[in-house]
Amino acid sequence: MSDIRLEPVTGSDPELKLALSASGLPTEDLEDTGRSFFKAVSSDRGTVGYAGIEACGDDVLLRSIVILPEHRGKALGKSLTRETLKTVNVSSAVFLATTSAAPFFESLGFVVVERADVPPAVLATRQLSGICPASATIMKLDRAPT
């Protein structure tokens, strides 16, 4: 059972931009096409965080997972990630780039992959082709083939 539910928001949502900026996450490509963003709402209707995904052909880039500071330490990041992954077609490979959260994502089933093993459509995203540093860790969700 999840502690949160997702509500769609646009890339131009000012609270989304503020939350990402405050956490040091990129905001420059939020309004580009192919992106979907969500506000994580608790049972009392309060916003606890935000998440996003980007379509890359048949694959998906998980991006912008952020829990607001006052809600951290309650395992909501895992709930938010799991709920966001439910929006992705089970046949899609899910990738992400991180500079600091690899252990967190490993706990959710992601494994480190080499850039050479990442599909061209994912590598061509603004996130992986220029916004994230080349030193970012690239990860893929390790799930059974469908």
Task: Label every PLM stretch briefly.
Residues M1-D29, V41, G46, A136-I138, ...:
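Short amphipathic alpha-helix that is part of the acyltransferase structural core
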Residues S12, D58, S100-A101:
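A generic "binding-loop/recognition-motif" signal
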Residues I67, G73-K86:
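Conserved acetyl-CoA-binding loop-helix of GNAT-fold acetyltransferases
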Residues T87-S100:
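Conserved GNAT acetyl-CoA-binding A-motif
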